[in-house]
């Protein structure tokens, strides 16, 4: 993505959040892996995060659709929106839960299923545990009840 294209998308993203009417600080960064990271600081974050981050997920999908329409260049890019470090904290929590569950599976040699999670949350767990040679992970179930199963490796 060119610097000019990024500036155009950055402006569109700021306008998107200005239309909420909420008191927000929005910082937008272009990351090396074609990801546009949108960091939002809000006085009332609950309106943007929602229950279990569902509103935040929908805002991210809507913003992605808006920016893809504004993009002149068909170069693919990703959008990552975080509000008051909600996703950052959630990711750290998920990594901790994943490692704890994996340790339990490695010791007991019994499978363990984690609670239902969004696709983003499942990806965090799979990525966190991918380098462990003693366990394997797989997603099971149907949306919205999809979850991660952690299994011992022989």
Regions found by a protein language model. Name each.
Residues 1-154:
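RNA-contacting regions in translation and RNA-metabolism proteins
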């Amino acid at each position: 993505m060119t610097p000019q294209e990024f500036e155009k998308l950055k402006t569109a993203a700021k306008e998107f959040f200005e239309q909420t009417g909420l008191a927000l600080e929005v910082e937008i960064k272009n990351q090396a892996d074609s990801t546009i990271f949108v960091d939002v600081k809000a006085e009332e974050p609950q309106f943007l995060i929602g229950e279990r981050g569902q509103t935040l997920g929908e805002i991210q999908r809507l913003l992605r659709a808006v920016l893809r329409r504004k993009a002149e260049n068909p170069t693919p890019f990703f959008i990552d929106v975080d509000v008051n470090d909600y996703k950052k904290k959630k990711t750290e929590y998920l990594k901790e839960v994943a490692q704890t569950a994996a340790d339990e599976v490695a010791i007991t040699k019994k499978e363990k299923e984690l609670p239902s999670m969004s696709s983003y949350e499942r990806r965090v767990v799979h990525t966190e545990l991918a380098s462990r040679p003693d366990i394997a992970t797989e997603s099971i179930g149907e949306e919205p009840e999809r979850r991660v199963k952690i299994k011992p490796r022989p």
